[in-house]
Amino acid sequence: MSEIKDVIVQGLWKNNSALVQLLGLCPLLAVTSTATNALGLGLATTLVLTLTNLTISTLRHWTPAEIRIPIYVMIIASVVSAVQMLINAYAFGLYQSLGIFIPLIVTNCIVVGRAEAFAAKKGPALSALDGFSIGMGATCAMCVLGSLREIIGNGTLFDGADALLGSWAKVLRVEIFHTDSPFLLAMLPPGAFIGLGLMLAGKYLIDERMKKRRTEAAAERALPNGETGNV
C-alpha cells in the first residue's frame, strides 16, 4: 500500500512531469489557451501513458535490451494512433483544435521517459498506476494553466466544452466577466510562459512551507515532555 501511495503522490505532486521535470513543455504552452483544450490533451496523454506503461511492462521480459527504445516508440505510436482516431470520431471539434499536438504525443518525453524509467522495471498493475498518476499530474497542470489563461484572456471558463464532452457540456461554460476584445498577452505563448513561471513559483512556495511545517513538527516531537522550545 505504501508503494501505491508513493507512486500516486510522486505522479501528482512530488515528481509532477510539468512542474518538476519540466517535460512536454511544447504542448503544455501551445495548447493551454483554454481549459477545454488543456483538459482534452491532458486526458489523451493520460490514456496514452496508462496503456503504453501497461503494454511495455507486460512485454518487458520479451523485449531485447538492445532494441528496446524502437520497440517502445512503436508501441507508443500504435496507442497514440488509436487515441487520435477515437478523438477524431467522437470529439471532432477538439480534434481540429488540438491539431498536430495529438500525434506529437509519440515524441513526448514524458511517455518515453516513464516507459524507460518505470514500466520496463515494474509489474503491469503498478506501471499502469504510474502512467495514470503521471498523466493526471500533467492534466492538472495543463488545466490550471489553461483556466488562468482563458479567464484572463477571454473572461470565460470551459468555453467550447461541448466539443469535448458533448452538447450537454454547454452548461459548463461560465462567463466570469464580459470583454469586447480578448487580452492577447494571456492567449499567446508569452502569456503561457508567464503563467507557467507563476505556477512553478507557487509550487516552490507550497513545498517550502510544507517542509518548514514538517521540520517544526519533528522538532516538537523531539523535545522532552513539558518543554515548548521557547526561551
Swiss-Prot record:
Key words of the record: Cell inner membrane, Cell membrane, Electron transport, Membrane, Translocase, Transmembrane, Transmembrane helix, Transport
GO terms under biological process: electron transport chain
Enzyme class: translocase
Subcellular localization: Cell inner membrane
Pfam families, A to Z: Rnf-Nqr
GO cellular component: plasma membrane
Enzyme Commission number(s) of this protein: 7.-.-.-
Membrane-topology annotation of the record: Multi-pass membrane protein
Transmembrane segments: 18-38, 39-59, 63-83, 86-106, 125-145, 182-202
Entry annotated with the keyword 4Fe-4S: no
Protein function: Part of a membrane-bound complex that couples electron transfer with translocation of ions across the membrane. Required to maintain the reduced state of SoxR.
PANTHER family cross-referenced by the UniProt entry: ELECTRON TRANSPORT COMPLEX PROTEIN RNFE (PTHR30586), ION-TRANSLOCATING OXIDOREDUCTASE COMPLEX SUBUNIT E (PTHR30586:SF0)
Assembly description: The complex is composed of six subunits: RsxA, RsxB, RsxC, RsxD, RsxE and RsxG.
NCBIfam families on file: PRK12405.1, rnfE
Similarity-based family: Belongs to the NqrDE/RnfAE family.
Record protein name field: Ion-translocating oxidoreductase complex subunit E
Organism name: Escherichia coli (strain SMS-3-5 / SECEC)
